């Protein structure tokens, strides 16, 4: 008797779940973000660091760089036709610039990365808010240094492959977080074009490289803001 009641209750639960979340299903899509990056630099010297060393690695102020990318999302959405929650895997390519400046110098650390993360999103009607977190794995770095002396600009550009990154960074793995907002324009029940905006940050870059003496901490980070466009395919909102 108890087993029969349990089976009946389970059947009703399945029916209720299907009816309540009739718009649930798998989703796929891609996203193209384009925006600005504001770099931040922080260094802490050891007590025995000479002044000439401190002057060479002095603190820099924030400057503006350029970010872009192409990411692909896949995951599952649970919804009732009006609101829902989706959990997406977010994988792709990102171009990230950390820009900083001093009195007579500007520096740009430009990374080409593979991006791996997750993107939970909360949907209501045509609107969606997301919070992404993950890592970026660099496969190339271009470091550009612009110096100014007597109103004359000099520029030096150095390219580093993935095997050479440890000469610049103790740990070149980038951690990122990202808040996004987008609006869906539906072309059909299962296809929508997305327009939105984002704000986020990249951090955890230890820029000590091979020169680990005299420096206890030398970190790069950035604040990223921009717009994004994408395409969404699948069932649900």
Please place each PLM-identified region on the residue numbering:
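Short glycine/proline- and aromatic-enriched beta-strand/turn motifs that initiate or cap beta-hairpins
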Residues: 19-83, 224, 230-237
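Positively charged n-region of N-terminal signal peptides that target proteins for export
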Residues: 1-4, 18
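Residues on the lipid-exposed face of transmembrane beta-strands in outer-membrane beta-barrel proteins
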Residues: 30-38, 66-76, 91-93, 116-124, ...
């Amino acid at each position: 008797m108890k087993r029969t009641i349990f089976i009946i209750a389970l059947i009703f639960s399945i029916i209720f779940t299907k009816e309540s979340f009739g718009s649930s299903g798998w989703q796929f899509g891609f996203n193209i973000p384009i925006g600005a990056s504001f770099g931040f630099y922080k260094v802490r010297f050891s007590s025995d660091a000479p002044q000439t060393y401190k002057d060479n690695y002095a603190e820099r102020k924030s400057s503006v760089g350029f970010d872009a990318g192409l990411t692909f999302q896949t995951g599952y959405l649970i919804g009732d036709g009006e609101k829902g929650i989706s959990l997406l895997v977010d994988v792709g390519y990102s171009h990230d610039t950390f820009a900083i400046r001093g009195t007579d110098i500007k520096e740009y650390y430009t990374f080409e990365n593979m991006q791996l993360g997750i993107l939970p999103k909360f949907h209501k009607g045509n609107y969606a808010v997301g919070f992404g977190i993950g890592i970026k794995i660099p496969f190339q770095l271009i470091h550009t240094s612009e110096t100014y002396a007597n109103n004359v600009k000099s520029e030096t550009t150095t390219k580093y492959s993935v095997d050479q990154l440890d000469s610049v960074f103790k740990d070149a793995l980038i951690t990122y977080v990202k808040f996004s907002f987008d609006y869906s324009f539906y072309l059909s029940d299962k296809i929508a074009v997305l327009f939105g905006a984002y704000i986020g940050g990249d951090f955890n870059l230890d820029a000590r490289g091979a020169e680990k003496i005299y420096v206890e901490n030398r970190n790069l980070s950035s604040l990223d803001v921009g717009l994004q466009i994408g395409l969404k395919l699948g069932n649900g909102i």
